[in-house]
Curated annotation (Swiss-Prot):
Protein name listed in UniProt: Neuropeptide Y receptor type 1
A GO BP entry: glucose metabolic process
Disulfides per UniProt: 113-198
Lineage: Eukaryota, Metazoa, Chordata, Craniata, Vertebrata
Gene that encodes the chain: NPY1R
Membrane topology recorded in Swiss-Prot or TrEMBL: Multi-pass membrane protein
Primary location class: membrane
Amino acid sequence: MNSTSFSQVENHSIYYNFSEKNSRFLAFENDDCHLPLAMIFTLALAYGAVIILGVSGNLALIIIILKQKEMRNVTNILIVNLSFSDLLVAIMCLPFTFVYTLMDHWVFGEAMCKLNPFVQCVSITVSIFSLVLIAVERHQLIINPRGWRPNNRHAYVGIAVIWVLAVASSLPFLIYQVLTDEPFQNVTLDAFKDKYVCFDKFPSDSHRLSYTTLLLVLQYFGPLCFIFICYFKIYVRLKRRNSMMDKMRDNKYRSSEAKRINIMLLSIVVAFAVCWLPLTIFNTVFDWDHQIIATCNHNLLFLLCHLTAMISTCVNPIFYGFLNKNFQRDLQFFFSFCDFRSRDDDYETIAMSTMHTDVSKTSLKQASPVALKKIHTDDNEKI
């Protein structure tokens, strides 16, 4: 691995494709920019840790859910889809992007040149829209429990639609991504002989900007706004429900339960937004005016933003699985290579799973304090 983040080529400009989500050109002038070996080593350790945690965490989550028949509900089906897409991101995005950013050329062949950005874009789109479907399921469960509720069949149809949309929106990478030695043709240095770069060749800059702007809305701002609205409505409904029970419940118990629910809902939205915000800003700035970013700071800044976004592949299994007691219990069997036990009688209802208990204003007025406590506890388990 080359320790330099940029190649010094006298009187020539070399174009690279660095973005994992939005392909683009970057002209490197006659700058002598180096990343310290200590920095490269630190980044390599960080990327390695994220890859290991992302692959093992999502793989464990998928196996645990698929092994337990009683866990195959709407939310868990969507969680498996989310984990599978995150697994692809951890495998396809992290190692290839990290190596290519630090090297001065592409070494993975023409097929991977096209497949890498295509699979990355597909995986990211699937991950984000899986979060959207989970938000929709929660919204219907809490806001409209007596109305339409998604079942397993709806979940499978939704997943199929997501993958079709993801593949369709990612096709430009498959079409316009090219492997070429064009930037090195006029370079006389031996170090650049038989070297290739992988970048996109859109028909024009306007086509490229239109496409990357569409991805910006499709993969970040649109889903984020929708998810925020869903969780805000859920928060308002739960807060109103808690206020109706103020006089019938122990105040300490009510406060702790409300706090747990609110923290979980807030964490889900914040984790998604915070992880992807740096890379989104970087891509947007670079698309419209790459000269704003100093040449010598480009690689390091991109890797830090990219690494932050990839941390989301580790965060999701924690929020959507490992904070639940069922997964903590099953993980002990998973990592000890023991068989999973069937727990039909004592299996705790997984957080966020669909249940058929709802609370109306009439039932709140008529129910006893003991019954209310039980109903509210069941409702909390649905989140």
